[in-house]
């Protein structure tokens, strides 16, 4: 009986990570370590190459100049029959949304105005029946409370308001410290660590709900 239960707890489904920078890498590292469940496939989407500012990558053994999206393949030593990394070394645009195939889609793109493309990704994922989570302000020194709740539940968060203007008003989870550029605080490794934990846990729960 116990053996049968253990045998049934195998990886299932797919989680897509849209954006694989400092936060995405942390989430990816968590996901590849999950056992007795978790994703069968992890899709990684990012068109950028690693440079000298990507310290968390070089600390983990990455080479400057290699694609960020390829790096999780190097770290994941699982047999592909157990867990497969699908690396897509390009940024998601309105023209390649069909590359996104995850049951759960976690969006952590940064730099500039990312709201319009994030909204398109969310809408595309929802059309496919996928569940979604993204960030909306993750600044802070590291002792902030990380909130994870539906977009419909937030107040006084300009990033959330902008996403709502793009038509995302419900059935989308947001992870945030509620600290933004306006608050003049840094983004520390401690904050990224905690946000990554919350996004990982939430993504795994969403995936489990899809298959149980």
Where in this protein do the model-derived segments appear?
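Adenine nucleotide-associated cytosolic modules
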Residues: 1-212
């Amino acid at each position: 009986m116990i053996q049968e239960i253990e045998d049934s707890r195998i990886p299932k489904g797919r989680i897509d990570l849209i954006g694989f920078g400092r936060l995405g890498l942390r989430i990816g590292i968590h996901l590849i370590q999950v056992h007795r469940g978790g994703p069968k496939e992890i899709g990684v989407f990012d068109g950028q190459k690693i440079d000298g500012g990507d310290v968390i990558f070089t600390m983990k053994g990455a080479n400057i100049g290699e694609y960020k999206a390829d790096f999780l393949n190097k770290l994941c030593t699982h047999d592909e029959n157990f867990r497969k990394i699908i690396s897509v070394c390009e940024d998601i645009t309105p023209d390649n949304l069909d590359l996104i195939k995850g049951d759960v889609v976690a969006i952590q793109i940064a730099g500039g105005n990312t709201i319009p493309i994030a909204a398109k990704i969310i809408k595309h994922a929802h059309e496919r029946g996928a569940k979604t989570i993204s960030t909306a302000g993750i600044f802070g020194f590291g002792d902030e409370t990380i909130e994870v709740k539906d977009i419909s539940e937030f107040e006084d968060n300009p990033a959330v308001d902008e996403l709502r203007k793009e038509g995302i008003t419900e059935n989308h989870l947001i992870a945030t410290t509620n600290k933004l550029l306006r608050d003049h605080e840094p983004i520390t490794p401690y904050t990224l660590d905690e946000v990554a934990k919350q996004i990982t846990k939430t993504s795994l729960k969403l995936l489990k709900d899809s298959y149980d």
